[in-house]
Amino acid sequence: MKITEGYMPYLGYKTYYRIAGECSGNKKPLILLHGGPGSTHNYFEVLDRLADEGRAIISYDQLGCGNSYVEGHSELWCSKTWMNELIELRKYLGLNELHLLGQSWGGMLSIEYLCDHKPEGIKSVILSSTHPSSKLWAQEQHRMIKFMSQEDQDAIAKAEATGNFDDPAYLAANERFMLLHAAGVPKDTDPECLRRPKKIGTDSYITAWGPNEYTPCLLYTSPSPR
């Protein structure tokens, strides 16, 4: 299978992209929008095998993480940056027609892209593990917190009330929450792309989303009313 890697100049930095297969195949390409913000494209490599069916599978690291990592520059970390990045990447790779898959934060970006920009050439859209409303998301995460021990619930509530997200009790509680409801530890038997070390965009995540999965700062503007 042919793997093509490259970089697109963007805002004075570089956006890394990866193409499995050929864009000239008999099926329209599928572009993948990863989660986070700041989670990298790595886990999408499990979909490389779809390229054997004659469809290019395109993933990329959104600015601020992975091979597109940028140190600092908190002014960049908003949906506008990543929205325009997607628009520019389509132009750069000549993706006039394509299928779109957005996972988690990538799904939020996909929804905003479709609602606000009404792009042409989108043949289909797949939304995975995502939502249209940060407010509803936070409500559901807090419902799941209630299934945790009282000690963990208290530690999380205290952190949210005080704004101190460095307390050891909170950090331990949040780690347990993530293992239970968000992201387990990769096993030795998992595909290499899931076990590979990656440069997570912590700054972009905290700035654009918040300190954790259940306390969104709401810099992301929910398109749900639209």
Task: Go through each PLM region and give its residues.
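N-terminal cap/lid segment of alpha/beta-hydrolase-fold proteins
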Residues: 1-14
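Conserved HGGG/HGGXW glycine-rich cap/lid loop of the alpha/beta-hydrolase fold
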Residues: 13-70
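Glycine-rich, phosphate-binding/catalytic loops in enzymes
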Residues: 46-51, 74-77, 118, 142-145
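Active-site loop/oxyanion-hole signature of alpha/beta-hydrolase fold enzymes
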Residues: 62-105
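Conserved hydrolase catalytic core segment
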Residues: 97-139
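Flexible "cap/lid" loop of the alpha/beta hydrolase fold
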Residues: 125-162
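Conserved alpha/beta-hydrolase catalytic His-Asp/Glu region
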Residues: 160-216
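Conserved small/polar residues in nucleotide/adenosyl-binding loops
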Residues: 220-226
